[in-house]
Amino acid sequence: MDQFQHIDVQGAQALLEQGEAKLVDIRDPQSFAVAHAESAYHLTNDTIVAFMEDVEFEQPILVMCYHGISSQGAAQYLVNQGFEQVYSVDGGFEAWQRAQLPIVRS
């Protein structure tokens, strides 16, 4: 895959339930701390190196932001780093909340 793919929140949740995909949230630390999707990893400039060391390049990666816009750039970045299956979650965390999918709140 030379480019990321789009996935809706239901498709993202289905991949997570299969136990193979990794969900990353690229929102700011305050937003992530208030609420985030269950099992989401907070991907930041400070955590990217550890993330890339811990995750297999073949593992599907789901990238979530606020509304599904900035996740596209982050998803393409991960593809460029060598990740093979990268998805931008359409609608982002807002769509995840609207769909009433599992959320962790502080």
UniProtKB/Swiss-Prot annotation:
The protein's enzyme class: transferase
Domain called Rhodanese: residue spans: 17-105
Catalysed conversion reaction: thiosulfate + hydrogen cyanide = thiocyanate + sulfite + 2 H(+); thiosulfate + [thioredoxin]-dithiol = [thioredoxin]-disulfide + hydrogen sulfide + sulfite + 2 H(+)
Active site (catalytic residues): C65
SMART domains: RHOD (SM00450)
Keywords (A to Z) from UniProt: Cytoplasm, Transferase
One GO CC annotation: cytoplasm
Disulfide bonds: none
Catalytic activity, EC: 2.8.1.1
Coiled coil: none
GO molecular function, one term: thiosulfate-cyanide sulfurtransferase activity
Gene Ontology biological-process entries: glycerol metabolic process
A Pfam cross-reference name: Rhodanese
Localization of this protein: Cytoplasm
NCBIfam families listed in its UniProt record: PRK00162.1 (NF001195)
Protein function: Transferase that catalyzes the transfer of sulfur from thiosulfate to thiophilic acceptors such as cyanide or dithiols. May function in a CysM-independent thiosulfate assimilation pathway by catalyzing the conversion of thiosulfate to sulfite, which can then be used for L-cysteine biosynthesis.
Family, per entry: Belongs to the GlpE family.
Protein name: Thiosulfate sulfurtransferase GlpE
Gene name of the encoded protein: glpE
